[in-house]
Amino acid sequence: MHNTRMRSLDLECLVTVTMPFGKYKDRLLADLPGNYLNWLARAGFPRGELGRQLALMHEIDHNGLRGLLDPLRKRG
């Protein structure tokens, strides 16, 4: 049960946390363009929680699963 809850929170953060720096500063992580996420994946994600969140968003985008975030957007 704990893992399911954690995954839900991980996804929720993508529609609530904003990018803290760079060209896409203040944009929701879920709204970052795929080409930027690909660049970050090649260049290296930042350390810590933000890097983990960006890596998750990259995986979601790369696998064509952005639609998974739509119900979470509607909740907010």
Regions found by a protein language model. Give the residues of each.
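DEDD superfamily 3′-5′ metal-dependent exonuclease/proofreading module
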Residues: 1-76
